[in-house]
Amino acid sequence: MGSCSPQLPLICLSDQTLKPGSSKWVKVRSDVRKALEDYGCFEAKIDQVSMELQGSVLKAMQELFALPTEAKQRNVCPKPFAGYFSHNGLSESFGIKDANILEKAHEFTQQLWPEGNKSIKMIQLYAEKLAELDMMVRRLILESYGIEYFIDEHLNSTYYRMRLMKYIARPDNDITAAVGANVDNGANDNADGDANVNDDGASIGVKVNVDVGDDVNDNDSVNIGVGVDINVETNVNGDLDAEANGDATAWVVGAVSGNASVGAKEANVDAELGLPSHTDKSLSGIIYQHQIDGLEVKTKEGKWIRVKPAPNTVIVIAGDALCALMNGRIPSPYHRVRVTERKKTRYAAALFSYPKEGYIIDSPKELVDEKHPRAFKPFDFVDLFNFYHTEAGRRAPSTLQAFCGVSAGK
């Protein structure tokens, strides 16, 4: 039965065997394009990051999150929502801009350890390897569409931001509500929630701890589905501490409540842990799950694929910015996190690429034709982000479509 479950495409991106211009490069290029067009993401088997480095990064993350709260709170940034976040002792996350650059990584270290800490080198090296992988993937994408001339300009117009995340292990008697795919983009990133379900299964109260990106604002409306095809309209009011340019940050939520008819079966299924479905705003992201799974991706057919962690594998996922750049050829997939493990702490790391401020995202003319008419107007990513924080942006089912879709009437 398990063999019939949908799975993401698995593509080998081994640095040792994949060389530009080789027959394998051409084959992988085609596979990457097909996977992204079909799913918006794929699982990649890599050798760029050794098991030893992965272990060192996990150890460094554990050391990082073990710091006293007052020390962690020194991870601040002039740019809004780019520092340390914690919510009710349930989750924590750090954001590091340009984590792949040693000097920038050291600046992050100085915030937490004025005397310095050598472990940051492992995180920087990890980010550097993932950045190299990301650039290779984006090169493969552009080549597959015959726009090689655009590669250098594109790669030089982006930067990286890393997010390090920790999900605190929950007790066995903790009841949680799964959050479905019908989520207002105002709360358009990963969230984990606790739910209290009445004996009659008719009423729930949800506290949402959101592991999100730069796209979340503090007074948002969220449609939370508890069970199958059941939505709950929930007003979220809280303090925001999400990164301005990172898709896997965190959000402090003040209060969330709602009512829904929840069957016992659905309540049991969703009592594991739910994180709202969302699309990333980035160009691309590379996600690594350390040992404990949780990531799920929604297919075009509406099925959820649960991605199991495996040695030397990562998830490559397209964001809204890439969707716009590629004129909608590559979708930005909905995905969520459901942590079902109990008494185990989950660590995850993600590296996201973003357009630099002032760079205009505009689909190359080769991607616009009769079969694929222009889907999005040119825009600056910063303007998209600012629109997201307006009333119209928060309410739109698709921030990208509402902001720059050719049918948006703007």
Curated annotation (Swiss-Prot):
Residues that, per the record, bind 2-oxoglutarate: R346
Start and end residues of each Fe2OG dioxygenase domain: 258-355
Pfam families documented for this protein: 2OG-FeII_Oxy, DIOX_N
Source superkingdom: Eukaryota
One BP annotation, GO: glucosinolate biosynthetic process
Binding site for Fe cation: H278, D280, H335
GO molecular function, one term: 2-oxoglutarate-dependent dioxygenase activity
InterPro entries: DIOX_N, IPNS-like_FE2OG_OXY, IPNS-like_sf, Iron_ascorbate_oxido_reductase, Oxoglu/Fe-dep_dioxygenase_dom
PROSITE patterns, sorted: FE2OG_OXY
Cofactor(s), names only, from the UniProt record: Fe(2+)
Keyword Nucleotide-binding attributed: no
Keywords, sorted A to Z: Dioxygenase, Iron, Metal-binding, Oxidoreductase
Enzyme Commission no: 1.14.11.-
Family listed: Belongs to the iron/ascorbate-dependent oxidoreductase family.
Described function: 2-oxoglutarate-dependent dioxygenase involved in glucosinolates biosynthesis. Catalyzes the conversion of methylsulfinylalkyl glucosinolates to hydroxyalkyl glucosinolates.
The protein's name: 2-oxoglutarate-dependent dioxygenase AOP3
Organism the protein comes from: Arabidopsis thaliana (Mouse-ear cress)
Source organism phylogeny: Eukaryota, Viridiplantae, Streptophyta, Embryophyta, Tracheophyta
